[in-house]
Regions:
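Terminal low-complexity/charged segments
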Residues: 1-170
Length: 170
């Protein structure tokens, strides 16, 4: 029996533009997955909208992770993957924060699964999730004074000739 309601990327982006037109910075589709870059001040409202809008119903947080692309001129970022289980549709939401103020609101009030994901993102990238119930390091030692997945440090000893950061995505 065919589904009477088939969600597609056009519907999702249309709903987002209706609510957040001034805050959408980029839209891209890769392998049929919609990717939307949002201004960081409204990220919590966008995630809430995607979850609570009855037509969209993105009620499952698949993952949340940090990113850092300094060679592309992009500061620190967070990528959220949301899933509508009823329609089996996924959406990727990205937002970027400046290195001078790497903070975003927590979404643990929307998805309890975000708790450890936000802690891991803080632990490795230093992104502070305001309002998080326990934003402490989760994998690294507490006294570590840097964030190991930021691309601010060379991967290898610069005097070694057998290693080249270009081969490791830098």
């Amino acid at each position: 029996m065919p589904n009477a309601f088939l969600m597609d990327n056009t519907l999702i982006i249309g709903k987002l533009y209706q609510q957040f037109s001034n805050d959408i910075l980029n839209v891209d589709v890769s392998s049929d997955m919609l990717s939307v870059t949002i201004a960081h001040p409204v990220i919590h409202e966008v995630i809430r909208f995607l979850k609570e809008n009855p037509e969209l119903d993105f009620g499952f947080l698949t993952t949340l992770c940090g990113i850092h692309y300094p060679d592309r001129g992009l500061p620190l970022g967070v990528v959220y993957h949301l899933h509508n289980l009823r329609e089996n549709v996924r959406v990727r939401i990205k937002t970027f924060v400046p290195l001078t103020d790497p903070s975003l609101p927590t979404i643990t009030d929307l998805f309890s699964a975000a708790n450890w994901m936000e802690r891991e993102t803080y632990d490795f990238y230093g992104i502070i999730f305001q309002g998080h119930p326990d934003l402490t390091r989760i994998l690294n030692v507490e006294y570590l004074d840097f964030f190991p997945l930021r691309k601010e440090y060379p991967l290898e000893d610069p005097t070694r000739e057998d290693k080249d950061d270009r081969y490791f995505g830098r």
